[in-house]
Amino acid sequence: MLKLLWLACLPAAYVNTVFTQTVAYASTEFGITEQGQGFAAAIVRWGVIIAIPLASYADKVGRRRVIIGLAWIAPLIISLGALSPSFTFLVATQTIGRPLGIALTVFVLVFATEEMGTNTRAWALSILAVGSGVGAGSAVGAIPLAGISDSSWRLVYLIGIAWLAVAYVLTRSLPETKRFLALHEEQTHHTDVETHIHRDRLWLQIAVAVLTNVFVATASIFQSRYLKDVRGYSALEISMFITLTTIPATVGLVVGGRLADKVGRKAVAIATVPTGTLLFASSFALQGFAMWLIAIVGGVLLGISYPAMAVFRSELFPTAHRNMASILIMVASLIGGSVGLIVAGYLLDNGMSYGRVMLTFALGPVIVAALVAAKYPETAHRELEDINPEDAHLQGS
C-alpha cells in the first residue's frame, strides 16, 4: 500500500514544484520583475480554492476515486505551460494545474494516515515525503534544460507528461481505505451518523500553516532567483545547489518520522522548526562554503520537523471530514503565504536584501513552535478513534 502512495507522490510533487523552479527563467523571456514573479506565484497559490469541492467529494465518495482522477489530470494540465504564448497564459495553466497536484498530495497523506498503524503514521508520512522529494527533485534536475535558451524552460513542463505512467499503475492497483469503507457502511445503515470538524483545532492549524508558509513559500520561490542574480549561479549550478542541499534533508525526513512516532510529535517540532528555519534563512545572507553548509544543516532540521507537523493535519479530524479539514488548512496556508510572496517581492524590488527579508519572515515558524508547545495535543501512540472520539463507532464496523 505504502509503495503505491509513494508512487502517487512523484507526479504530485513534480506538479507542485515545476512553476517555482522555472518562474525565474520564464520571467526572463517575458520580462517580468521580481515583484511580478511574487504576484504571479501568489495568484497560482490562490487557485488552490478549486481543491475545496474536490475534498468534499473525496469525503463523500472515497479517497481512491479522487486520487486516481487527479493523478491523470494534474500532469496533463501542468504540461500546457510548455505552450505558453505569454506569462499570463503560463500563470493561468499553473493556477489550475498546481492546486490539483497539491490536492493529490493532501489526499495521499490522508489515505496514509487512515491506513497506517498507531506507531507508524509519522514514519509513513516521512517515507511519502521522500517520494515527494524525488518528484520535486526531478523538476529541479530538469532545470539545466531551462538554461539552454531563453525559451527552453518550456521543456521542463513538457516532460511532466511522463508521470501519466503512475496514474495507470494507481488505476489498476490502489484500493479504498478501510476507515472510509467502515464509515460508508455505517452511513448506509445508520443515516443519523454525524460528525463535525473541531473548529478550535482547525483555526489553530490554519494559524500554524499560514505562519509557516509565509517563510517556506518565499524561500522556495526566490531561492533560484537569489542564486541566479545575487550569486551569479548558472542553471546547472542552481540545480546542483538545490539538489545537493536537499539530499541530506531527505535523511532528516526519515529520522524525523521515527522520532515523531517514538518520542512524540511535539518534542520534535518544538526543537527543530525554529532552529531549522533560522539557519535556512541565514543562508540567504551568506556565500560560498558557509551558504552551502548552513543551507544543508537548516534543511536537515526542517526535514526532521516535517513528519511531526504534517501528521497533525489529518490526525486531529474525524474520517468524515478528514480531507476537507486538510484542504482548508492547505488553502489558508497558500493564500496566507501568497501575501508573504507579494510583500517579499515588493521589499526585494525596493532594495531590501534577501537575507533581511528571509530572516524577517523566519519569525513566523518561531511563533509556530510556541503554539505547538502551548496548544497542540500529543497524538503519538494513539488510535485515530481515540483522538477523535466521534469515530469510535467505526472500530467495530
Region annotations inferred by a language model:
Residues 41-56, 243-255:
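Central cavity-lining transmembrane alpha-helices of secondary-active solute carriers
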Residues 50-85, 260-266:
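Conserved MFS/SLC helix-loop-helix module at the cytosolic interface between two early adjacent transmembrane helices
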Residues 19-20, 200-253:
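Extracytoplasmic gate region of multi-pass secondary transporters
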Residues 1-34, 219-224, 340:
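Extracytoplasmic
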Residues 31, 62, 83-88, 232, ...:
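Helix-breaking motifs and short loop linkers at transmembrane-helix boundaries and internal kinks
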Residues 93-130:
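Cytoplasmic helix-loop-helix junction between adjacent transmembrane helices
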Residues 120-147, 163, 327-341:
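Glycine-rich segments within core transmembrane alpha-helices of 12-TM secondary carriers
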Residues 15, 96-108, 298-309:
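Core transmembrane helices of Major Facilitator Superfamily
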